[in-house]
Amino acid sequence: VVGVLDAGLGDTVTPEDRVFWLDEYRRNYKGDVGRERLRTASINLRDRDSLHARLGSVTCPVLWMHGTADAVYSVANAEDGIRRFSQSADAQLKIVDGGQHFLSASDPQHVNPATVEFINKWR
């Protein structure tokens, strides 16, 4: 879990935030239930391409935020993914310069206001 967390947070997260998220991940993936949760998350990441075929049937608004420093998925993956929401009422891709995979941890100053604005637009 620590390796995945480090890759997702990148090097821009403060030491205090890194400790917070590491503690949260350890708590979340603790014991048998936590290991099952981690296994399911890993399978979902591995098999995510099978989801692409279903994205064309999504009709709700979609906000996809992606960091340019994401070590897991590239901006090109995000650009391809957002195009697949062909029936969405509003499919937006916002790129965050220098943002990591765990964008809400590395760049809350971008994620939080964009999310609030998007939700307010569609509620």
Please provide the spans of the model-predicted regions.
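Short, conserved loop/helix-junction motifs that constitute active-site signature segments
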Residues: 55-59, 84-88
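Acidic catalytic loop of the alpha/beta-hydrolase fold
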Residues: 69-73, 101-102
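Residue-level signal for the nucleotide or nucleotide-sugar donor/cofactor binding architecture
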Residues: 33, 73, 106
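Conserved alpha/beta-hydrolase catalytic His-Asp/Glu region
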Residues: 1-56
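Catalytic active-site module of serine/aspartate enzymes centered on a nucleophile-bearing elbow/loop
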Residues: 88-123
